[in-house]
Amino acid sequence: MGTYAVDMVYACHSMQVEKCRMLDLGAGGVKLNGATAQDPASERTHHVVIADNDIGFGGRVFLAGVGVASLRASHIDIVHNHIHDLYYSGVSCGWLWGYEESTSFDNTIAYNHIHCLGHGVLSDMGGIYTLSVQPGTVIHHNLVYDIEKANYGGWAIYPDEGSSHILIENNVCFGTSSSCFHQHYGRENIVRNNIWAFGREGIVAFTRPEEHIGFTFERNILLTKGEPVYTGKGIEKIKADMNLFWDVEKKPLSYAPDLFKPEENESMDQLKARGYDLFSVVADPKFADPEHGDFTLAPDSPAFDIGFVPIDLSTVGPRVGSAD
């Protein structure tokens, strides 16, 4: 396949791409495009289901091919796909930089198995990547791991420029070459009840603070190996509390405003003294085998004390009888 296996261009609606194998791809698997808010409404793309597909071994001609790219489209369900072995992002959703009116909204990205991306070839990517104001968009129950950047930017979930009003919950993300979660800039996103583990440059990053609150971060579990739990300027522009932190090497936990200036790092006690993560806890979450990707919680895990709800990923990826 020379470019994308499926390419929908403008005014596509009420369609399904299901139970397909899309492998050995010049670019990516599925691309949707639609009209902007300034274009005629009749040209908008909406109500498309992309489900139970195996999408992999892409970018063989165009390195920046994406597993599923939803550009300027609404009511798109990207669910139960296996997306793997690409040189760039697994899922991209949005595609309008900044806070202008967007035609990307009410999208669902859920139960996808996304892994082995980047391979050290490209930079600035995410297992799941978003752009623009997207009210009603939900990212939940995805398993994302092994994101390897070239020079910078290998994140699991990456709300980029203008990403706003997105709910990110019940995802398990680990083994990234940068942080597990990174918000460049956006407003009023909610990030709750996720597991973030073993980002080589930290766990949670935020890089462009603005006057408003960027995101609310609560009831997450953050697991690290000596790396900072938070990185970036502007921690005062996020609302973080009721989280659980743990360093498997039992090193002191820290917030790093600048990764290149470790002398500026703050301890968790210093953060609490400034009013952040006041009711968060530092404790071993008692995962079954996190080093090998098993994040099952023991019955007596202290994570339950912060209100964490176990994440059921038993149906992640294509369902029985489908492409996988």
Report the location of each language-model feature.
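Short glycine/acidic-rich loop motifs that flank beta-strands on beta-rich extracellular proteins
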Residues: 1-6, 26-32, 59-66, 87-93, ...
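Structured core elements
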Residues: 7, 77, 92, 127-129, ...
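Right-handed parallel beta-helix
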Residues: 12-27, 40-59, 74-88, 101-118, ...
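Active-site proximal loops enriched in glycine and acidic residues that flank catalytic Cys/His/Asp
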Residues: 10, 34, 72, 93-95, ...
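Extracellular, surface-exposed repeat architectures
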Residues: 63, 68, 75-77, 122, ...
